[in-house]
């Protein structure tokens, strides 16, 4: 399973990358707005931080022509740029255009198996179903991941499933158990993955006992 970080904060990307399990980055307009810096400065700094990993950068237009124009400009920034496109009929047109040119795409805001099927059918490199937002409206987001995984396996679609809108470590573990390709995770949740209260208690006890060891070698 691959781990992406869902952020536009270069400091968070840098810290996550130090853990040596980061495989990519996803961003969106909301995350970029939080940084409060010029758009091009933000995306260029992200790409410089992880030049060898895929970075999803989202278009802002709602029509295919505008998406293509914006996406081509983004793609010029580097070979690791993935064009993030909303799951709409116009978006699917843009996805087909980019994939036919060898430019990777990430179809975002996927909330149903039907949407995922269409995105996989047109050849999207990645699809991003949002589990947390489904949970917010009293649906079970992970059920969607199971359905999409089954469809993908039935037809051997090449699209990689990015579990998005991850809210907690349970989402990550359930994604791994289902067999999703990728989870894109906020930095706060990445930090939680390595923690367990019993680990902290055990380490504290070991350190305390270590102090009583005579003639310690180091």
From Swiss-Prot:
The active site is at 84 (schiff-base intermediate with substrate). It catalyses: D-sedoheptulose 7-phosphate + D-glyceraldehyde 3-phosphate = D-erythrose 4-phosphate + beta-D-fructose 6-phosphate. It is found in: Cytoplasm. GO terms for molecular function: aldehyde-lyase activity; transaldolase activity. GO terms for biological process: carbohydrate metabolic process; pentose-phosphate shunt. Keywords: Cytoplasm, Pentose shunt, Schiff base, Transferase. It comes from Sulfurihydrogenibium sp. (strain YO3AOP1). Pfam families: TAL_FSA. The keyword Transferase applies. The gene is tal. Belongs to the transaldolase family. Type 3B subfamily. Pathway: Carbohydrate degradation; pentose phosphate pathway; D-glyceraldehyde 3-phosphate and beta-D-fructose 6-phosphate from D-ribose 5-phosphate and D-xylulose 5-phosphate (non-oxidative stage): step 2/3. This is Probable transaldolase. Its EC number is 2.2.1.2.
């Amino acid at each position: 399973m691959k781990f992406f970080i869902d952020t536009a904060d270069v400091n968070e990307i840098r810290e996550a990358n130090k853990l040596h399990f980061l495989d990519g980055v996803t961003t969106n307009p909301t995350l970029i707005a939080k940084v409060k810096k010029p758009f091009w400065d933000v995306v260029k700094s992200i790409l410089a931080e992880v030049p060898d990993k895929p970075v999803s950068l989202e278009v802002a237009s709602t029509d295919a022509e505008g998406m293509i124009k914006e996406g081509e400009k983004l793609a010029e920034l580097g070979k690791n740029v993935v064009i993030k496109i909303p799951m709409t009929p116009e978006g699917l047109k843009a996805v087909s255009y980019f994939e036919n040119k060898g430019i990777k795409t990430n179809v975002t805001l996927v909330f149903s198996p039907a949407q995922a099927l269409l995105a996989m059918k047109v050849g999207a490199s990645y699809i991003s179903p949002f589990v947390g937002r489904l949970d917010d409206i009293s649906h079970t987001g992970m059920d969607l991941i199971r359905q999409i995984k089954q469809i993908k396996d039935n037809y051997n679609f090449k699209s990689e499933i990015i579990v998005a809108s991850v809210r907690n470590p349970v989402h990550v573990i359930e994604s791994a158990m289902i067999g999703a390709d990728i989870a894109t995770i906020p930095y706060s949740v990445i930090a939680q993955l390595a923690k367990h209260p019993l680990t902290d208690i055990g380490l504290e006890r070991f350190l305390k006992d270590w102090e009583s060891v005579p003639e310690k070698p180091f």
